């Protein structure tokens, strides 16, 4: 007979909602924000990314990797509108999914963060970082 610890099974059933950041912990700036505002939001939340919101919906994202590439290009304008610099199709996962599924998506796409949605894909309710999943025991 095979016995499995309840803790091990519980960790495998961990949901994205169990480890996601939400509410005031969700990094987000408005579509018309300046690059300097996005940098401050990324720094404040320490997740390496900020969402870009237009009319209450996720319209894009900007990551610390994007910032490094902008800096390397020599065209760093802190007053540039973030909408001109953002990725318009950020990676997302549905809130009811298992954390292990989120981890698989992150590994497959070589990313550290997924936006979490509920209902429609632009209804963002949180963000999950790979470190949060791994600290959860996966």
Per-segment meaning from a language model:
Residues 46-51, 55-90, 95-97, 101-104:
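Helical hairpin unit composed of two closely spaced alpha helices linked by a short loop
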Residues 7-12:
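Glycine-biased, small-residue-rich flexible motifs in mid-sequence functional cores and linkers
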Residues 5, 24-29:
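Short, surface-exposed loop/turn motifs that are enriched in glycine and acidic residues
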Residues 53, 60-65, 112, 125-133:
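Short hydrophobic beta-strand motif reused across regulatory alpha/beta modules
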Residues 13-26, 79-90:
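Bateman (tandem CBS) regulatory domains
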Residues 28-46, 71, 92-112, 116-120, ...:
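The conserved cystathionine-beta-synthase
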């Amino acid at each position: 007979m095979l016995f499995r610890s309840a803790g091990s099974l519980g960790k495998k059933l961990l949901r994205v909602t169990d480890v996601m950041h939400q509410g005031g912990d969700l990094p987000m700036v408005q579509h018309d924000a300046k690059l300097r505002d996005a940098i401050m939001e990324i720094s404040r939340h320490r997740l390496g990314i900020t969402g870009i919101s237009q009319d209450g919906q996720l319209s894009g994202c900007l990551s610390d990797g994007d910032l490094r590439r902008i800096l390397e290009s020599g065209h760093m304008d802190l007053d540039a509108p973030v909408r001109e610099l953002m990725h318009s199709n950020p990676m997302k996962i549905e809130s009811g999914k298992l954390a292990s599924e989120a981890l698989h998506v992150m590994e497959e796409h070589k990313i550290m963060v997924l936006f979490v949605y509920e209902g429609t894909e632009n209804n963002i309710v949180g963000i999950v970082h790979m470190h949060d999943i791994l600290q959860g025991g996966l």
